[in-house]
Each structure stands twice: as structure tokens, then as C-alpha cells.
């Protein structure tokens, strides 16, 4: 028995606790500190008091993609274990701009942009989380009332030297790239959120580790039990190289049409498919391992890619939508034209092919249109277009760009 008067009683690590710990650790990058978190789980089980699990997201864009759902899936698993999930919308911290992973100052958003983005954020997140078991908070609740006096007192709790331990700040400092003072406030304000919420566990991407540790340190200074931190891997985009990002065009939005979502998922490499299974699928690890063994034994990996795509489409739409998306995909793979393509009427024949593709909404720019023609990705009524200077005469025809973009065009003089 410990003679340390500050030591905490140890709670028994039961099979229930071991199961909860295994669920928590699935697919994570790092859990700090695992022994502490096991004790938090054990205490929760013994006292029947749920843990407070925090996830903060700044509404920097209106749409959520599959990359965001990696951490949301983990939150849902923790909800299903009976814990309280706090979905924190960073309406105050968005005004500062998160510098994590940046090599230059991130421009802060306006309050109007933040409010507009925040409207759709939780509605999309609720496609993953259990709405009835989710506590929604805004960090302006406690950050705005701090005022200048409170902000200065908070800033006194951390040093510039500690801030410069963060890799992205260090690189910018050593490279002579400016770091604005307000950027140092971001980790502090995120950390103060944990104090305000008395969080037991905070989740984030691997690029958030420093900020999460600041929260742990501030809780100690405020006399609270320190939160554990759990970092989730950053999901690679469809290219399998860079992290999924709307700005890079390698993303799958959770509000996309079922056919588009299905087609994008079927386009990933066989190697990336297993990564998506691990981070996005709700199937057991044993089942995924069995699938992998069957693929290595000669079964077509496409079979498993279809399972993955259908599971994800069904989650965000419905099982019926997933079945229809598979039918549509197979139809297109055989050279067929989908039934639900948009009809577009254009004028100005004869019209340059680049302009036609742009005006039909099939490409964002004429330069993108010409790139697709160079790559053999443009078809009119099934015939590949190779002439970038083509002028298209008046008529009605089906135009295709890539595997998934179609339009039924009526072109007049």
C-alpha cells in the first residue's frame, strides 16, 4: 500500500475495462498516457460515472469529408461505451486561426464565415455521432468573457520557449518566417477549453498533439485531474499520398451523392483500401484480417472494395442507395450512361470544346478541360475527343469527362 498522501486509489482493471481500452485503441496513432486512461475507465466503471470526451473542430469550411470522420468514428465508439461526448465548435478559436502544420500565418475567418460554416457542421457530424448522446458547446461561451485581463493571466501560464518546442513554430522561427503573437494564443485557448469542460480525454489528429498537451498542462495548473490525449492518424486522400483535403481535390464529402461517393471509393488503390478499412470501416479487425488473407490467397480485391464502398455509402445515405450506386457503377464500367445525368442547354454553336465543358459544369476551367482532353478523358456520344481546338456544332449529345461526370447537352446557335 502506498504511503504517499496524494496517491489516488487504484480501481480494478476488469474484463469490461480491458474491452473498452481495446476499442479505444483501435486505429489510433497514440494514446497518452495509456495507464492513466485505463484507470479513468476503471473508475468510470466502478462509480458508474461516464468520462467526458472532448473533440474540438473549428468550422473553417462548410463541409465535412471522410478524413474528418476518422476522429468522429472514434467519438461514436466511445459514445457507444457509455461516455459523454462533447462536440466543441471552435467559434472563438476560428477567429485566431489554428497554426498547426502551417509554414505561414493562417488567415483568420470573419465571424460571418464562422457562423455560416458552423450551421452545417453538427448536422453533418450527426450522421456519425449519436445526436441524443452528444453535448454541443461553443468555446466563445467561456473565451469571450475572459476579456483582456483574463487573457493576459492565461498567457502568463505558458512561456515562449515552450511554444517554440512545437515543430512548425521552430521551423518558421529558424527559417525567419514571421510568427504572429496571436498564433501563440491558439494552443492556449484550445487548452483552456479542456479546463472549462473538465475533459477526461481529448481527441485530435496527429498534427494536434502539441495543443492537446497544452490542455493537459493547463488542467494541472488549474488543479484539475489531467486529461489523457488520443491522436488519430490523418487519412490519406484518394491519391494515397497527401492527407485528404478539399483544397487538394482528393476528398470524399459525406454529403456527396451516393453514386459519386461510391465511384470515388472504387477508384482508390488496393493498398489504400486496407488503410480505409482500418480507419473508416466498422467491421471487426478479425473480419478485415480475414478479407486481407482471402485477397492474398487470390480473391479479387475488387470484391472487398465494393464491400467498403457500400458500407460507407449506406452509413451516410441508405442501404438502398448503396445498392443503386453499385448498379450505377457496374453500368458505367460497361460503358453505359447513368439515368440521372443533368440536362444542360447552351447557346453559341459552333462552340469551342473547352468552353462547352466549362459551361456544362463538367470542369471548373477551360485549362482543366484541355488537360482532360490530353489525357483522353473526354467523350461525346461515346467517341473520345482528341482535338483541343474542336468546335462543336449545334445538336443534342451526351458529354462525358472522366469516369463519373456526365451531361446531356442541347447546343443551339
Swiss-Prot record:
Locations listed in the record: Cytoplasm
Family annotation (Pfam families): S4, tRNA-synt_1b
Residues binding ATP: 246
Protein name: Tyrosine--tRNA ligase
Annotated Gene3D superfamilies: HUPs, RNA-binding S4 domain, Tyrosyl-Transfer RNA Synthetase
Chain ranges for the short sequence motif 'HIGH' region as given in the UniProt record: 59-68
Catalysed reaction equations from the record: tRNA(Tyr) + L-tyrosine + ATP = L-tyrosyl-tRNA(Tyr) + AMP + diphosphate + H(+)
HAMAP family, A to Z: Tyr_tRNA_synth_type2
Motif segment ('KMSKS' region): 243-247
Amino acid at each position: 500500500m502506498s504511503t504517499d498522501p496524494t496517491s489516488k486509489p487504484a480501481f480494478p482493471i476488469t474484463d469490461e475495462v480491458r474491452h473498452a481500452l481495446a476499442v479505444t485503441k483501435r486505429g489510433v496513432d497514440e494514446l497518452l498516457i495509456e495507464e492513466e486512461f485505463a484507470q479513468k475507465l476503471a473508475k468510470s466503471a466502478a462509480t458508474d460515472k461516464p468520462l467526458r470526451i472532448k473533440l474540438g473542430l473549428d468550422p473553417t469550411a462548410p463541409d465535412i469529408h471522410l478524413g474528418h470522420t476518422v476522429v468522429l468514428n472514434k467519438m461514436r465508439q466511445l459514445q457507444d461505451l457509455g461516455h459523454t461526448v462533447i462536440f466543441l465548435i471552435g467559434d472563438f478559436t476560428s477567429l485566431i486561426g489554428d497554426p498547426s502544420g502551417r509554414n505561414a500565418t493562417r488567415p483568420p475567418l470573419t465571424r460571418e464565415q464562422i457562423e455560416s460554416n458552423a450551421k452545417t457542421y453538427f448536422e453533418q457530424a450527426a450522421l456519425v455521432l449519436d445526436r441524443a448522446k452528444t453535448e454541443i458547446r461553443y468555446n466563445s461561451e467561456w473565451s469571450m468573457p475572459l476579456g483582456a485581463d483574463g487573457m493576459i493571466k492565461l498567457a502568463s501560464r505558458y512561456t515562449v520557449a515552450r511554444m517554440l518546442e512545437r515543430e512548425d513554430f521552430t521551423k518558421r522561427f529558424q527559417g525567419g518566417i514571421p510568427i504572429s503573437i496571436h498564433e501563440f494564443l491558439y494552443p492556449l485557448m484550445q487548452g483552456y477549453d479542456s479546463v472549462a469542460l473538465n475533459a477526461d480525454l481529448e481527441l485530435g489528429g496527429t498534427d494536434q498533439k502539441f495543443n492537446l498537451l497544452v490542455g493537459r498542462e493547463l488542467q494541472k495548473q488549474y488543479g484539475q485531474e489531467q486529461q489523457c490525449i488520443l491522436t488519430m492518424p490523418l487519412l490519406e486522400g484518394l491519391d494515397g499520398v497527401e492527407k485528404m483535403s478539399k483544397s487538394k481535390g482528393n476528398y470524399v464529402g459525406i454529403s456527396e451523392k451516393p453514386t459519386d461517393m461510391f465511384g470515388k471509393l472504387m477508384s482508390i488503390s488496393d493498398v489504400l483500401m486496407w488503410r480505409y478499412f482500418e480507419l473508416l470501416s466498422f467491421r471487426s479487425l478479425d473480419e478485415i484480417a480475414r478479407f486481407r488473407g482471402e485477397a492474398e490467397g487470390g480473391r479479387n480485391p475488387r470484391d472487398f472494395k465494393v464491400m467498403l464502398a457500400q458500407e460507407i455509402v449506406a452509413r451516410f445515405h441508405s442501404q438502398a442507395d448503396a445498392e443503386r450506386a453499385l448498379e450505377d457503377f457496374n453500368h458505367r464500367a460497361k460503358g453505359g450512361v447513368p439515368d440521372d445525368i443533368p440536362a444542360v442547354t447552351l447557346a453559341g454553336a459552333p462552340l469551342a470544346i473547352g468552353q462547352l465543358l466549362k459551361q456544362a459544369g463538367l470542369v471548373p476551367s477551360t485549362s482543366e478541360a484541355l488537360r482532360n482532353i490530353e489525357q483522353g478523358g473526354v467523350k461525346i456520344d461515346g467517341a473520345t475527343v482528341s482535338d483541343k481546338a474542336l468546335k462543336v456544332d449545334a445538336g443534342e449529345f451526351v458529354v462525358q469527362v472522366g469516369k463519373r461526370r456526365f451531361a446531356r447537352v442541347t447546343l443551339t446557335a
